[in-house]
Amino acid sequence: EGMVAEPAALAQEIKELLLEARTRKRYVVTALSNLAVILRPIQVPKMPLKEMEEAVRWEAERYIPFPIDEVVLDFAPLTPLSEVQEGEQVQVMVAAARQEAVAGVLEALRGAGLVPVVLDVKPFAGLYPLEARLAEEPDRVFLVLDIGAESTSLVLLRGDKPLAVRALKQLKVLLVDGD
């Protein structure tokens, strides 16, 4: 779930699409499927970045259902670090994906001759077109809903700051015309 089953086959499809589009662009920004990523806000003390990375990794172990050594882990502060005093708690959004999920996507892209420059997570990638609008009202609460074929993501924000994220797997969606 959320993994590229056949990277070589996907690479071939991407190559064909690129030929059809007659593009020479090779740099790509993409996002991992909702089903491949665990997103969780956690709190850690503000400290030098290297130490904070270790603290996030240690704290994230409590929430990840597989060995921490098998994941690619990243985080982003939800409050600018310049606004937090050293030693105070800072809330960060943690993203964790199994290494094989990341490797499958990267293998397919590189196999198609592309150069991945950003690998984001789908719930946040969908917010980019809304960034300016969300930032205009920093105290307003927004719910962004992305309904997809394989999953739905909900992102609750105050202004442009995420408060909570949920990814829901679609069990089965039937679209019926008429009755």
Q: Which residue ranges define each predicted feature?
A:
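Gly/Thr-rich phosphate-binding beta-strand-loop-beta motif of the actin/hexokinase/Hsp70
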Residues: 1, 26-31, 131-164
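Short glycine-rich, Thr/Ser-proximal phosphate-binding strand/loop in the N-terminal lobe
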Residues: 1-4, 43-47, 160-179
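Active-site neighborhood for divalent-cation/phosphate handling
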Residues: 4-5, 9, 13, 27-134
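Short amphipathic alpha-helices and their capping/turn segments at secondary-structure boundaries
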Residues: 14-23
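Solvent-exposed loop and beta-edge segments used for protein-protein assembly and interaction
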Residues: 22, 86, 146-148
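Structured loop/turn residues at beta-strand edges in well-structured enzyme cores
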Residues: 23, 114, 163
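Generic beta-structure capping elements
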Residues: 33, 97, 157-159, 171
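Glycine-rich beta-alpha junction loops
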Residues: 123, 149, 169-172
